Curated annotation (Swiss-Prot):
Subunit structure: Part of the 50S ribosomal subunit.
Name assigned to this protein: Large ribosomal subunit protein uL15
Gene Ontology molecular function, alphabetical: rRNA binding; structural constituent of ribosome
Organism for this UniProt entry: Pelagibacter ubique (strain HTCC1062)
Regions that span the bilayer: none
Gene it is expressed from: rplO
Keyword rRNA-binding: yes
SUPFAM superfamilies, alphabetized: Ribosomal proteins L15p and L18e
BP GO terms, sorted: translation
Amino acid sequence: MTTLNTTGKVLYKKKMRVGRGIGSGKGKTSGRGVKGQKSRSGVAIKAFEGGQMPLYRRLPKRGFNAIKRYQAVIAIMNLEKIQTFITEKTINSGDVINMALLKKLKLINKNSQKLKILGTGEIKDKVNIEADLISKSAVEKLEKAGGTIQLKK
């Protein structure tokens, strides 16, 4: 027979009910202190791990942050693309191919600040190109096709 004095140890502690008056010991602020972010409900402090050193501070720094806002946005155009535009009659072979023309025809991004011509593919038509940057292979292929190149400074 089990009686109150022979029940044995309690296996778990009873859960404290908070906010049930000051006499309970956990009334009014319910053990949260006074005001501030930690006293409100539903608010967790981001990356806070209870005082333990957070993961982002335990790991070493890696790499660097490139300041991209100071770098020019370069539009890249290959010779094969230019040849395709000429064959499709998007660009006339007599036109001067420059950034203004390519932006007008929406062939490059409107935010581009410089135009670079690369030598991928072949070009058959004579073309006049005005660009900021150009690769050696592109220069060779354009001269071979009889085209002209004008570099902007």
